[in-house]
Amino acid sequence: MAHAIKLNRSAPNLTTSQIHYPLGDALPPLGETLEVAPGVRWLRMGLPFALDHINLWLLRDSIEGVEGWTIIDCGISNPETEAAWETIFASQLSGLPILRVIVTHMHPDHVGLAKWLCERWQAPLWMSMADYLTAQWLSNKEGGAAIGAKMGSGGSADHLERHGLNSAEDLALIRGRSDYYSRMVPGMPPRYRRLMEGDVITIGGQLWRVQMGYGHAPEHATLRSEEHTSEL
């Protein structure tokens, strides 16, 4: 016989209570950065969603004797995000270039401006294969974007309706988002360097190990510092 489980919602969340925030409530203003570790800068870009921002990263780097920066994740493609990046380029890089762009996964807030950034700095894109190809297909006007235009958000509405979503209003909203992905990811760089599980990348003299996750995205890359137990 099954027994009901009673939840004590007034009990403290021990996991949350043990989290330590070294910077307290400090946040980097738009167009600025905060250094969270030597050579690691945190920045935020706005998003037009309920979750109204994304955390991005700049890591001081050196490749083949050239000093500069590695970007980790990009923000969505829109004029506001481009302008915020230009402000950062002008004021936060100490006059140094962007050497490469690493994208952790294919969601628009992470990959949206990858093409623009790579073209802006003639920098290579590093990304997992599954997420690069998925983003390439979804942003391609002859691929996922074209299917979305024909089927209504890539068939998402039909899929959700088959699984119980019966609100005509909600289904209409979903069908109206047929070009939702390609609006925020208008294109991808034509080539990339593949990230794989277990890769070790040297960024600014520090070693970062690539760990792949599956679920949040097809092949989500996390970078874990071999020296400081940091994760990005």
Describe each model-derived feature in a short phrase:
Residues 66-80, 173, 181-193, 200-202, ...:
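Metallo-beta-lactamase
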Residues 14-15, 36-44, 175-184, 204-206:
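Short Pro/Gly-enriched beta-strand edge/turn motifs at strand-loop
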Residues 30-96, 222-225, 230:
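Conserved beta-strand hairpin/beta-sheet module of binuclear metal-dependent hydrolase folds
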Residues 39, 59, 73, 105, ...:
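Divalent metal-coordination and catalytic microenvironments
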Residues 44-47, 110, 212:
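Conserved HGGG/HGGXW glycine-rich cap/lid loop of the alpha/beta-hydrolase fold
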Residues 80-82, 87-202:
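Active-site HxH/HxHxD metal-binding segment of metal-dependent hydrolases
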Residues 1-25:
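N-terminal presequences and immediately downstream first alpha-helices
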Residues 36, 49-51, 195, 214-217:
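A short catalytic or substrate-binding loop motif that flags glycine-/basic-rich loops and adjacent residues
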